[in-house]
Structures are given as structure tokens and as C-alpha cells.
């Protein structure tokens, strides 16, 4: 059994990680930390986990207890993993970080977007960006894995086939993305209140969202050149889900884009390229570690529209983290993640 530690288990990504690991036949959660909830039983805080984690309680973070684990997940706000990851890595413990702390390769760029100096720039050379569809082989050898964000996952998976094949004009990419309210986290905030978010939709961070440099970094690597991306996120009145509508101009209209996408993702267990003409729905991936994609070329012109949907808490966070765990420890990549989405 893989001995697992979790730092920060009281947010939505933390409880989702617990839910997924409860169904994992090769993982055992030995330590879960929370300074604010130390001493509280996991099953008391999350009744949906009763019968799965009886006897496990939140504890104050203890470096020795965490270092005794085979792998530690960080489901924390940005900056926390900076302070603890180095000590764990030195002890031989693997680290899978769900925060943004190690996603960007440039420490100065990270500081610009997150409003504070990067706390562990010396570790960036060891960090592997945990998008399995791109970095599977690097993940196998990793010590420190940076799990991609939710918007970056849906957007990159939608654009990758076009950019890798050199078919899209990389200077004019548009990502029009919608997210459920759980993407804002569990903390109390006026914008997340039911009366504020219900029956309404709005764009936000149009000037620049923290996920913009992460998406741009991945797309630039895929294209092999600089890219121009307009990324506009929206808050929608649903709990879970990301719907990304992606626009690109293709340079060769003779290419069969459906075949291109199907070939690119033919061997990917968690990317579903839907039949031509499909319109994937967020409800089809709720609770599942799947990205569903459809590609369109309206009126047969040179503008391509890619529709990409994920559950922001699963393929956009905790499910992708478990997928990385499986790859890292040489397990079947689908282990503990084969459940279907929830309907209705």
C-alpha cells in the first residue's frame, strides 16, 4: 500500500481527494492536516466519508509524520507548499501539489501573478507539470509534481492537437471559459453566496487571470513558438464544471480535424473525443476524471471551435492528482478513477 499524507484537507479539493482515495485499492491515507480543525475526525466533518476514514482525524502539520509517508498531496492555498516541500523531498517523500506553487517555470513570473516572491525557486528545476497527456514519461520519474489548474487543463487539452500539428495560428487564440462556483474555493466570499451567484452569470478577471500565464506556458511549449491568447473566465450558477469554448484560425482547411483529434487522444484513458457535431455538457463529466472534447468548423471556414468540458474538482484538480499518483508509482493509470459521471 502507498502511504499517503494530505496537507490541507478541509477545502473542496481536499475532500474530493479523500473521496477518490477512499476508492483506491493501493492507497492508504495515514496523515491529514489542518491547523484550524486539528483533532476533528474526518468522518465528522464529512459525513459522506463515514465508513471510509473512521479513526482518521485532522492533525497539526508535523514534518516527521508527513516525511514518513510515501507521497504527500498539498491541497492548500498558494505559498504553503513552498515552505514544506523541500524538507519532504530531502527525506525522500514524493510531493504532488494541487496548488499553483510549482506550475510556472519562471519564479519572477509567478511572483508577478501571485503577489509575493516565490518561496522555493530552487525547487522549480525539479517540478514536473502534471498534465499526463503531455508529460507522462516525465511524471514517472518525478519527485515533485505540479498538478495543473482547472481552466488550464480544459484549455490545453482542447488546443493541443491543433498547435502540435502546426495547424492553428498561434498568435490569435481565444479561450472563453465558464466555471462552477466550487472553483472559487470553500472560503466565505460574497460573490459565492447563493443569492449572488444563483440565476446569474458574469465574466471576471478579464484584464488578466492567474491561470493565464500557466495556459500560455503550456500552449507555447506545444506550439514551439510564442502564442497570443485571450482568456476570459466566467462564473456560472452551477457547483461543479468547466466549459471551455476555444477559438483558433487554421492555416490549412483541408485537414480532417475530427481525425486529428481522435488520433491524438486515441490512447488517452481520460480524454473522450466525441463524434463530429457533438456538444459536450458539463453534467456528463460531473464526478468523473474525464475531459470530453468536440471540434467544429462552422460553415466550413477557417475558424475552428473546440468545446472542452471537465469537472473542475476531478480532472481539473483531485482526480488528475490521483492520475499522477498512479503514473508515479507504476500503477494502472485508471486505478481508482474508472467511475462514470453522475446523472442527472
From Swiss-Prot:
Belongs to the NAGSA dehydrogenase family. Type 1 subfamily. The keyword NADP applies. Pathway: Amino-acid biosynthesis; L-arginine biosynthesis; N(2)-acetyl-L-ornithine from L-glutamate: step 3/4. GO terms for molecular function: N-acetyl-gamma-glutamyl-phosphate reductase activity; NAD binding; NADP+ binding. The active site is at 150. This is N-acetyl-gamma-glutamyl-phosphate reductase. It holds the Pfam family Semialdhyde_dhC_1. It comes from Pseudomonas putida (strain GB-1). Its EC number is 1.2.1.38. The keyword NADP applies. One of its GO terms (biological process) is L-arginine biosynthetic process. GO terms for cellular component: cytoplasm. Its main location: cytoplasm.
Amino acid at each position: 500500500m502507498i502511504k499517503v499524507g494530505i496537507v490541507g484537507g478541509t477545502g473542496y479539493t481536499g475532500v474530493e481527494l479523500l473521496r477518490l482515495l477512499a476508492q483506491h485499492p493501493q492507497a492508504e491515507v495515514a496523515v491529514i492536516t489542518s491547523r484550524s480543525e486539528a483533532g476533528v475526525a474526518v468522518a465528522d466533518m464529512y459525513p459522506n466519508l463515514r465508513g471510509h476514514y473512521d479513526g482518521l482525524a485532522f492533525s497539526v502539520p508535523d514534518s516527521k509524520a508527513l516525511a514518513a509517508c510515501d507521497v504527500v498531496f498539498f491541497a492548500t492555498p498558494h505559498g504553503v507548499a513552498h515552505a514544506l516541500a523541500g524538507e519532504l523531498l530531502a527525506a525522500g517523500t514524493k510531493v504532488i501539489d494541487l496548488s499553483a506553487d510549482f506550475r510556472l517555470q519562471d519564479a519572477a513570473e509567478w511572483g508577478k501573478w501571485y503577489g509575493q516572491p516565490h518561496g522555493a525557486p530552487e525547487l522549480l528545476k525539479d517540478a514536473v507539470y502534471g498534465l499526463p497527456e503531455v508529460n507522462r514519461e516525465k511524471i514517472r520519474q518525478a519527485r515533485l509534481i505540479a498538478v495543473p489548474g482547472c481552466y488550464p487543463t480544459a484549455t490545453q487539452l482542447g488546443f493541443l492537437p491543433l498547435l502540435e500539428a502546426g495547424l492553428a495560428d498561434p498568435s490569435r487564440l481565444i479561450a472563453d471559459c465558464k466555471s462552477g462556483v466550487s472553483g472559487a474555493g470553500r472560503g466565505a466570499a460574497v460573490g459565492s453566496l447563493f443569492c449572488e451567484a444563483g440565476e446569474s452569470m458574469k465574466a471576471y478577471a478579464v484584464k488578466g487571470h492567474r491561470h493565464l500565464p500557466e495556459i500560455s506556458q503550456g500552449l507555447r511549449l506545444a506550439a514551439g513558438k510564442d502564442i497570443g491568447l485571450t482568456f476570459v473566465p466566467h462564473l456560472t450558477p452551477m457547483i461543479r464544471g468547466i466549459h471551455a469554448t476555444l477559438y483558433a484560425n487554421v492555416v490549412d482547411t483541408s485537414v480532417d480535424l475530427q481525425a486529428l483529434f481522435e488520433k491524438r487522444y486515441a490512447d488517452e484513458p481520460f480524454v473522450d473525443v466525441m463524434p463530429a457535431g457533438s456538444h459536450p455538457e458539463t453534467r456528463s463529466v460531473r464526478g468523473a476524471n474525464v475531459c470530453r472534447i468536440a471540434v467544429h468548423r462552422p460553415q466550413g471556414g477557417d475558424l475552428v471551435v473546440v468545446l472542452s468540458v471537465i469537472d473542475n474538482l476531478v480532472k481539473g484538480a483531485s482526480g488528475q492528482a490521483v492520475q499522477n499518483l498512479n503514473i508515479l508509482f507504476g500503477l494502472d493509470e485508471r486505478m481508482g478513477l474508472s467511475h462514470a459521471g453522475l446523472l442527472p
